[in-house]
Amino acid sequence: MGAIDLSFSQSLLFSSSRSNLSSSTHRSVSFLPPGSKSRCLPPLRSMSHDDDTASKEVKLWGGRFEESVTEKVEKFTESISFDKVLYKQDIMGSKAHASMLAHQGLITDSDKDSILRGLDDIERQIEANKFEWRTDREDVHMNIEAALTDLIGEPAKKLHTARSRNDQVATDFRLWCRDAIDTIIVKIRNLQRALVELALKNEALIVPGYTHLQRAQPVLLPHVLLTFVEQLERDAGRYVDCRARLNFSPLGACALAGTGLPIDRFMTANALGFTEPMRNSIDAVSDRDFVLEFLYTNANTGIHLSRLGEEWVLWASEEFGFMTPSDSVSTGSSIMPQKKNPDPMELVRGKSARVIGDLVTVLTLCKGLPLAYNRDFQEDKEPMFDSTKTIMGMIDVSAEFAQNVTFNEDRIKKSLPAGHLDATTLADYLVKKGMPFRSSHDIVGKLVGVCVSKGCELQNLSLEEMKKLSPVFEEDVFGFLGVENSVNKFSSYGSTGSNCVAEQLGYWVNKLNITST
């Protein structure tokens, strides 16, 4: 698979009416005043530098320091190598912040316009791969702010008014997570469609259902496939819930205590599509529960996908032989010429361990931290980025696999008679005749014992053999025996009966807007 882009386009939620900015929600937010014209600034001047120059550049926080950090400390503490993927969100937050500062009279409109145009130019440079990310500038925030200062000078120094990197990074990360969730939900819908379409192509196919990996009862294949559709729907719901809880703005909380400057946090929250500002400034910068919830949801989704992978790896084996993946989603062996392996689904199963591990990493990271912000939080990014990239790949390849498999109907049908799959249906027959279920369970168990000793199936027994165990059996019993008859007897809501499964399929066809297969 190709690399997955982890920079997401920003989508906005409903805006707060308390803002002085536009309350439109489903269009891009403009941070230029009406009637102003955007102009393209000259390219950033070269930021190439040797080690000498780098060591002499004063850190933006360096006022009280008399020595530069050592090279080892600088390399150990930098995060630009991974947090630069937040550049869109960082620029977006800075635009909203600058517009608010101007609106509140904390900077001039001229300064604001210079800042906005400079940020636009930096974004273009980044997207054209012409921006030089500098380790000595530590992180995405400092790289962009320092570059903005190089570009426009004095106005850039006013941008950080009433803002700390503590609330800045929390804002950026919430925006990133919000966009990532939107992308994942779209991918889940695509996988659900692939599974439903596969079910529609095999609507009447009966397969063995298993418990303890032992044959249990006959079920329709669409019923099995819709199991994963339902699980994915709950996963999507968890993402929606997570998105709603994280969609509150930390911006303006500053380091931890807020500010005495007359900022408008509702204005920036609205501009960025947040529901409203977070109520408590310490909470805004000191908690990463939104990251944990997102990581848990990825892990839970990963477990569901892992079980799908396990099912299909088994079914593709010679021992089962229920499905055949196409060559386009299979791989071979370097030594065994005959091999055709369902590697994508094996890796889906395997990569679930990564998303679980990423969750455990951040759970451990957050345990026992004192209030408020701690540099430990820098370590929440890589697990989050890895988990998100991994779960997206797992979802995508599962959909690809579902679109490139065929079920071996003849092989499945030949295997169906084995295992006495209709035994429970036979017990239900006796219940319908008035027998207590425990008694019917005992009688059918004894009939299975007869079949095992004779090497036959229940439907091969004669009526006389059945009557030896209970006079309740009549000729109509044969309408309950055999996998087809057994499946047709299921009628409870959500069951594997043909009518029930048809209703389930109809529900998902409508919900997912599937028009053809």
From Swiss-Prot:
It is found in: Plastid, Chloroplast. Pathway: Amino-acid biosynthesis; L-arginine biosynthesis; L-arginine from L-ornithine and carbamoyl phosphate: step 3/3. It is an enzyme of class 4 (lyase). The record marks 346 as: Increases basicity of active site His. Keywords: Amino-acid biosynthesis, Arginine biosynthesis, Chloroplast, Lyase, Plastid, Transit peptide. GO terms for molecular function: argininosuccinate lyase activity. Pfam families: ASL_C2, Lyase_1. The active site is at 212 (proton acceptor), 333 (proton donor). Residues 1-45 form a transit peptide. 2-(N(omega)-L-arginino)succinate binds at residues 79, 166, 211, 341, 373, 378, 381. It comes from the Eukaryota. Its EC number is 4.3.2.1. GO terms for biological process: arginine biosynthetic process via ornithine; L-arginine biosynthetic process. InterPro entries: Arg_succ_lyase_C, Argininosuccinate_lyase, Fumarase/histidase_N, Fumarate_lyase_CS, Fumarate_lyase_fam, Fumarate_lyase_N, L-Aspartase-like. One of its GO terms (cellular component) is chloroplast stroma. It catalyses: 2-(N(omega)-L-arginino)succinate = fumarate + L-arginine. Belongs to the lyase 1 family. Argininosuccinate lyase subfamily. This is Argininosuccinate lyase, chloroplastic. It comes from Arabidopsis thaliana.
